[in-house]
Amino acid sequence: MTPTFWTFSFTDAPSISVSDFTYEHNEATRTLTCVPVGNPSRYTYYKWQHKSTHGVLIRELDGGQNGVLTLPSIPVEDRYQDSGEYVCTAGNGIVGRYGNVKQTGSGYAIINGV
């Protein structure tokens, strides 16, 4: 009798995290990183959303397909405007708990010294 082996492969929509960051106003490069964890681990990234601390959408930004958002270069005296919530949207083709293929996670950026 030949033994039978079963291989199971589970799929899971990603859970997404974005770390909070504090930057000094004179830092020229300001980046945020989207970290999805799911199976399969091949992700599509969508536009980032920048929201005020009150949840109002300020702008949408392209972050590329590596999950890293580099904030646009602006004059030092205007960098305080980069403070707020940043929402990453990504997916791996698997439908999540609430029926969505795209999942979101967010973190906050604070710009000090202006």
Label every model-predicted segment.
Residues G38-Q49:
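Solvent-exposed loop segments of extracellular immunoglobulin-like
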Residues M1-F10, V87-V114:
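Extracellular/luminal immunoglobulin-like beta-sandwich modules
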Residues A28-P36:
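A short beta-strand segment in extracellular, disulfide-stabilized domains
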Residues Q49-I74:
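Surface-exposed, flexible coil segments in extracellular/virion-facing regions
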Residues M1, H25-T29, S41-Y43, I74-T89:
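Solvent-exposed loop/turn motifs of extracellular immunoglobulin-like beta-sandwich domains
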Residues V18-H25:
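Short beta-strand segments of immunoglobulin-like
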